[in-house]
A protein has these predicted regions:
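Amphipathic alpha-helical interaction surfaces in cytosolic regulatory modules
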Residues: 21-97
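Short beta-strand/loop segment at the start of cytosolic alpha/beta domains
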Residues: 1-16
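Short hydrophobic/aromatic patches at helix-to-coil boundaries
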Residues: 2-3, 95-99
Length: 99
């Protein structure tokens, strides 16, 4: 099961992802991004503390978020990733994009 929440902070948006971000949750996450992030023009922090699993589909969605933020000249940072997710970000050479 996948869930996403967003909190507006003073200088950024905090997105908390829960569960598994994979091919099965792509539609839910895409809808969340379209409804909650598309029209925002703020820096983004994505908290992965409760994200258990991510596959290549999920990684692709992170790349899309990065590109969207870059177009807006805003940053995106990932925090609290579990070791398995950190390792996947390093193996795929995208960890530097989200620091």
């Amino acid at each position: 099961m996948f869930k996403a929440n967003i909190e507006e902070k003073n200088d950024h948006l905090l997105v908390k992802l829960i569960g598994d971000l994979d091919v099965y949750s792509k539609e839910d996450f895409s809808k969340f991004c379209d409804e909650s992030l598309k029209d925002k023009n703020e820096n983004l922090i994505i908290d992965l503390e409760k994200l258990d699993y991510i596959d290549s589909t999920g990684l692709g969605m992170f790349i899309n978020i990065y590109k969207d933020q870059k177009e807006k000249e805003k940053s995106v940072k990932v925090i609290n990733a579990k070791e398995n997710i950190k390792k996947l970000f390093k193996i795929t050479d995208i960890s530097d994009l989200f620091e």
